[in-house]
């Protein structure tokens, strides 16, 4: 299947178009928050966003594109609200644990919404490759910048990719009730320790 282009915010020429895209994603998040993945239907999103269904499809070709784009926006929001002072100083272990904990709390706050966005991300096909890649890079960047006290190194980006995969795997385990929130925290702490060490025994 070929990649289907989604109109990103940077590609929208007018303020009206950017506002319309924002309304569409707001509507998607609101519907998913109350009903999960199955509740996100294109017609329902169009009605809540006050746009024509045809217009919605020009912005987002499917509900998968919608939900993966919504996940990307949520990560951007979390990143923008992160207290950089809390990430300053300390060790890579402390800073990365802070970021992992922040993401865990954000995603566990609304299980239905998280289930909808994560399900779309995990099962997206090649047509949504651009959106999936964007979300993956956002995760990697957040973790890599948390590890680094400046510009992340190539090795830190590689480690961040592994942390992203472990984090997503454990988020899925929590969503499917195969792991508790405590289990997830312990597993991720172990992964971080193995990859970058602790305050007493740093590896990077």
Curated annotation (Swiss-Prot):
Residues 41-60 bind DNA. One of its GO terms (biological process) is regulation of DNA-templated transcription. Signal peptide: none annotated. Residues 18-78 form the HTH tetR-type domain. One of its GO terms (molecular function) is DNA-binding transcription factor activity. SUPFAM superfamilies: Homeodomain-like. InterPro entries: Homeodomain-like_sf, HTH-type_TetR-like_transc_reg, HTH_TetR, KstR_C. It holds the Pfam family TetR_C_20. Transmembrane segments: none annotated. Keywords: DNA-binding, Repressor, Transcription, Transcription regulation. PROSITE patterns: HTH_TETR_2. NCBIfam families: transcr_KstR (NF033703). Controls the expression of genes used for utilizing diverse lipids as energy sources. Homodimer. This is HTH-type transcriptional repressor KstR. It comes from Mycolicibacterium smegmatis (strain ATCC 700084 / mc(2)155) (Mycobacterium smegmatis).
């Amino acid at each position: 299947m070929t990649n289907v282009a989604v109109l990103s915010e940077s590609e929208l020429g007018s303020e009206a178009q950017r506002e319309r895209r924002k309304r569409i994603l707001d509507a998607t998040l609101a519907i998913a928050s109350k009903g999960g993945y199955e509740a996100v239907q294109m017609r329902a999103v169009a009605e809540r966003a006050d746009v024509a269904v045809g217009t919605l499809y020009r912005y987002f070709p499917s509900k998968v594109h919608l939900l993966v784009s919504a996940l990307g926006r949520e990560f951007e929001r979390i990143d923008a609200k992160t207290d950089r002072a809390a990430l300053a100083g300390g060790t890579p272990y402390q800073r990365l644990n802070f970021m992992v904990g922040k993401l865990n709390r954000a995603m566990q706050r609304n299980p239905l919404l998280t289930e909808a966005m994560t399900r779309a991300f995990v099962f997206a096909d090649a047509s949504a490759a651009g959106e999936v890649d964007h979300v993956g890079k956002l995760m990697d960047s957040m973790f890599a910048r948390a590890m680094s006290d400046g510009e992340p190194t190539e090795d830190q980006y590689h480690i961040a990719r592994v942390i992203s995969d472990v984090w997503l795997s454990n988020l899925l385990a929590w969503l499917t009730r195969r792991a508790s929130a405590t289990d997830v925290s312990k597993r991720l702490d172990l992964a971080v320790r193995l990859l970058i060490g602790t305050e007493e025994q740093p590896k990077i």
